[in-house]
From Swiss-Prot:
Gene name, Swiss-Prot/TrEMBL: thiM
Disulfide bond residue pairs: none
Coiled-coil boundaries: none
Function according to Swiss-Prot or TrEMBL: Catalyzes the phosphorylation of the hydroxyl group of 4-methyl-5-beta-hydroxyethylthiazole (THZ).
Protein name (database record): Hydroxyethylthiazole kinase
C-alpha cells in the first residue's frame, strides 16, 4: 500500500483492544495519534459485540486473568466469523506456566492473523529454547528469522518478532525492519504500542505481512525523529506522540529502512 497513513486518517478504523492495564492508556493514545479510533472493551458481556463493529482486534496478555482470556476468546471468535484481523501480543510468554498455557489455549481455539512478541516470546511459542525475564527477552538459541518463518508457516499467520531489528514473516516472505531508536526501549509500553499500530495498519491493508512491515517502519521512524529532539525517556515520550501525530507517508518514504530476506 502506497499511502497507508493517509488511508488510516481518512477512514479512521475502530481498533478494539483487550489489553493489559499497565499500558492501556498508552495504546489508546498511540492509536489516536496515528488517526485511528481506540476502544477498550473487556467485559465478556459486551466484548464480542464491540469486535463486530471494529476493523481490527488487538489482544495483549500482559495482565492476564481467567475472565480476560474468556473475553479474548469470545472476541476473537467474533472476529474470525467476520474476517476481522486479529493481533495477539504474547507478552511474557515463557515467564509462567499459566501464561504459557493461556497463550497456547488462544492459539488452539481461534485463528490469529498476526502473532507479535519479542524474540524470546515467539521462540517459546514456537517450541524453541528461550529465556524470558518477566516480560523482557533475554536469550534465544535458534536463528530468529528462521524461527519466525517456520512458526508463521505452522500457524498460517504473520509473525512479528520485535527487538533491535524487527522480523516479520508470513512463512514465504521475511522482512527485517531496522527503523527505530534505543530510547524506544527506555519507556514502558512501546512494545504494546507496536501491537496496536500493527492492528491499525492491518485494518486498512489485507496483506498482513506488508501491513506489519509498514507499521514497524512508521513507528520506528517516529522513534528516530523523536530521539533527535529528546534528552531522555521523559522528553522522548512526549516527542514520540508529537512525531506520530505530525507524521506523513511522504516523510516516512525517505526514512524506511528494511530488507527482504
Amino acid at each position: 500500500m502506497n499511502e497507508p497513513l493517509k488511508t488510516i486518517r481518512e477512514t479512521k478504523p475502530l481498533i478494539h483492544h483487550i489489553t493489559n492495564w499497565v499500558t492501556i492508556y498508552e495504546c489508546a493514545n498511540m492509536t489516536r495519534a496515528f488517526g485511528a479510533l481506540p476502544v477498550m472493551a473487556h467485559a465478556p458481556e459486551e466484548c464480542a459485540d464491540m469486535t463486530k463493529i471494529s476493523s481490527a482486534l488487538v489482544l495483549n496478555i500482559g495482565t492476564l486473568t481467567s475472565e480476560i482470556i474468556d473475553s479474548m476468546l469470545l472476541s476473537a471468535a467474533a472476529a474470525n466469523e467476520r474476517d476481522i484481523p486479529v493481533v495477539l501480543d504474547a507478552v511474557g510468554v515463557g515467564a509462567t506456566k499459566f501464561r504459557d498455557e493461556m497463550a497456547a489455549k488462544i492459539l488452539a481455539s481461534v485463528h490469529i492473523d498476526i502473532i507479535k512478541g519479542n524474540y524470546s516470546e515467539i521462540a517459546k511459542l514456537a517450541g524453541e529454547n528461550a529465556e524470558t525475564k518477566g516480560v523482557e527477552a533475554t536469550s534465544i538459541d535458534a536463528d530468529p528469522a528462521k524461527v519466525a518463518k517456520a512458526f508463521a508457516k505452522a500457524e498460517s499467520c504473520v509473525v512479528v518478532m520485535t527487538g533491535k531489528e524487527d522480523i516479520i514473516s508470513d512463512g514465504d516472505r521475511t522482512f527485517i525492519v531496522k527503523n527505530g531508536h534505543e530510547l524506544m526501549g527506555s519507556i514502558v509500553g512501546t512494545g504494546c504500542m507496536a501491537a496496536s499500530i500493527v492492528g491499525l495498519f492491518a485494518a486498512v491493508n489485507r496483506d498482513y505481512c506488508d501491513a506489519a512491515k509498514d507499521a514497524l517502519c512508521y513507528f520506528g521512524a517516529s522513534g528516530e525523529l523523536a530521539a533527535a529532539k529528546s534528552s531522555g525517556p521523559g522528553s522522548f515520550k512526549v516527542h514520540l506522540y508529537d512525531e506520530v501525530f505530525n507524521l506523513s507517508d511522504e516523510k516516512v518514504k525517505s526514512m524506511k529502512n528494511f530488507e527482504e530476506k
